[in-house]
């Protein structure tokens, strides 16, 4: 890292960190201060800061606000919750909402409990809210595991009327994934038909149930699907006047083309035509236009990691401004893998695949193979009845030959997958679980259009992302709820985003540009809605106005658009340290996309860049000033500044004094022990010599003593106080240097305690060892 010529110094009166004991490991926390991928949100707003752009709606003891329906004509949001349906004026204004209590009779609840269901499950969870016509809504609920549907007069909004069975339209419980859409006043639903949830079905529910058009029960049609979304596209959106309305269903199902112990899941899209009447003999009351294809959103493991479809949103441009586009969230089916990918799919690419080769499952090898073109009958199976087909005397699906219907019954799956629009995901993240997505198109100040996506997470956060080229850049992470909970539904209404969850409906202002306080902040936000106004000296939602406004979505070149702002140097914090301590200096830029560098004293020799800052090993050369400088959009500024100082005046010399005293004591101890041993040895030698001289004088016989003589035997001498302190025999048996026990050595680096600082000056201490 380059050395800095400018070294910030602590000024008088500036705060300093409290000194901490000698040889402690100081750890200062801080976020990432380096270049990161655009899948990481540029900025994050905690709940305390996010509340300014949020409006909440909740009713005590009412839960599961999971079904949202926006009626732009009446500026009303309809909310389906547990046992209740609300009608709220948009945007939220604090006005008292209208409500309908759609409760389950006690007899139904008792019957539900007798079937072994829990008390909390035996409620009416609203699953469908749809606009039936200008005066009525269609609604369906689980009704304590006995689905019911009815209509609501929106002018009176008092009760659910004309109740009828909801089987085949609505799931039996909210845990069963389902999807439904109204097209031409007709409900198209994808759900399960039986109580156990083992009979999946896609229906056109109009008239009597026995007259419905539905999917066949063959597992080749639907095999344990989890439905995600249903979308209706009209010929006008295609620019095809000869076409028919098409209904697309998105789901994940278990593949039958793999021989594996694991149930391999595959994301797929299916399409049916609104004019389908079924077959005359073969496929009676069954879809004759049901075709499905794999959706490929490659992940880190070449597609396996993105095998579960979580949600799909359709972005519909204005008529004549382009064709719709589907945005899908994909995740992994394997436990422990937190992977989310976002892919875009064009309807024309789906159409191309549906017009391509069919796949045939070979039962002997469980592998799918393409059907040869010569084996495909004419007219082509699965096609909608168009004017061109009518000219060929096929006025409806009832007039199709049996060979065509038999083929489509046995070959509903296409051989080729649908690839994403750019051939790869727009975003892949391994640390965030996305559950819901909505999208809209925004016109920037330059007139160029950008797709803005809102991604709801598993823990209740909202990520706002803009599509720039072939990738998504996540601009902001917004915490929605005080307590983490999944985002269950999202709808857009003009500049407001409406979010449904278990405990509330949250309204988010998507044009909250005023919180960006400077020109550089406004430009770096890269929000197509926001622009900096030199006239007002604030960040505003431009609304197509151009006078005195600047914006740069793709480059965010602050240096050329904004006047140079006066640099505000941060407070320099003094950090008291001791020799050999490890100190981590945090750097906390406001943007995770900023590139940061450290300027440090030229004498520092041991430093390590980390995700949370800079780690420095304290040496005399490491003393001095440190500065973290971050750059984004061509503008650089110092984010954090520190000054390493000795913990106290005695810290640096006391270390050398302590080590020197220890070494001196060590050598003095060896010298004293040696002198003591020499003196003891000489004393014993002199005593032995005196004994030998005394024996010579009395004619002592060194052999066996004769009878009548007295033998003299010497008992072992009792140990002296010196021997008790240092027994010679024990010392010689020791394993130390020279046969003696090793002396006590002063550990120059005792085990350091850990001090965790949440910032500077010292905030909290957690000492594990001192």
From Swiss-Prot:
Chain ranges on the Cytoplasmic side, renumbered to this chain: 681-770
Extracellular side: 35-659
Annotated localization: Cell membrane; Postsynaptic density; Perikaryon; Cell projection, Dendrite
Main location: membrane
Disulfide bonds: 112-122, 140-149, 273-384, 297-343, 513-530, 522-539, 587-628
Organism: Homo sapiens
Membrane topology category: Single-pass type I membrane protein
Residue stretches spanning the membrane: 660-680
Pfam families: PSI, Sema, Sema4F_C
Keyword presence, Magnesium: no
Record motif PDZ-binding, residues: 768-770
UniProt KW keywords: Cell membrane, Cell projection, Developmental protein, Differentiation, Disulfide bond, Glycoprotein, Immunoglobulin domain, Membrane, Neurogenesis, Phosphoprotein, Signal, Synapse, Transmembrane, Transmembrane helix
Protein family per UniProt: Belongs to the semaphorin family.
Gene3D superfamilies: ligand-binding face of the semaphorins, domain 2, YVTN repeat-like/Quinoprotein amine dehydrogenase
Oligomeric and partner information: Interacts (via PDZ-binding motif) with DLG4/SAP90 (via PDZ domain 2); this interaction may promote translocation of DLG4/SAP90 to the membrane.
Region forming the signal peptide: 1-34
Region (Disordered): 696-725
Domain Ig-like C2-type: 580-635
Gene: SEMA4F
Role description: Probable cell surface receptor that regulates oligodendroglial precursor cell migration. Might also regulate differentiation of oligodendroglial precursor cells. Has growth cone collapse activity against retinal ganglion-cell axons.
Residues carrying covalently attached carbohydrate according to the record: 64, 133, 509
Protein name: Semaphorin-4F
